[in-house]
């Protein structure tokens, strides 16, 4: 039961944080590139890498990794925004978004793990 509470608590704060950051960026960004989701996802990749690389206890992994990072990052919005770019025939932005999200996300997860392991 305590494990579920840790995940739920982390998830609550992760979702609220993503909502706040996403809305802040969307009000200020008028380009076709979905910068809010991109920054949220690469930040989340780095932080999750750092958490895991740091070797935190299972409780902290549940609270921060599964709960907070699980709700903070958003795979579904990334996919939806990618499809929307395709539907608008914005192919160059689509390719940039797709490739940058995967390449930078993996790089940031790696860096987070390395820095967390120091």
UniProtKB/Swiss-Prot annotation:
GO terms for molecular function: fluoride channel activity; metal ion binding. Keywords: Cell membrane, Ion channel, Ion transport, Membrane, Metal-binding, Sodium, Transmembrane, Transmembrane helix, Transport. It is found in: Cell membrane. The chain crosses the membrane at residues 1-21, 33-53, 55-75, 93-113. It is a multi-pass membrane protein. Its main location: membrane. Coiled coil: none annotated. Na(+) is not transported, but it plays an essential structural role and its presence is essential for fluoride channel function. One of its GO terms (cellular component) is plasma membrane. It catalyses: fluoride(in) = fluoride(out). Na(+) binds at residues 70, 73. One of its GO terms (biological process) is cellular detoxification of fluoride. Fluoride-specific ion channel. Important for reducing fluoride concentration in the cell, thus reducing its toxicity. Belongs to the fluoride channel Fluc/FEX (TC 1.A.43) family. HAMAP family: FluC. This is Fluoride-specific ion channel FluC 2. The gene is fluC2.
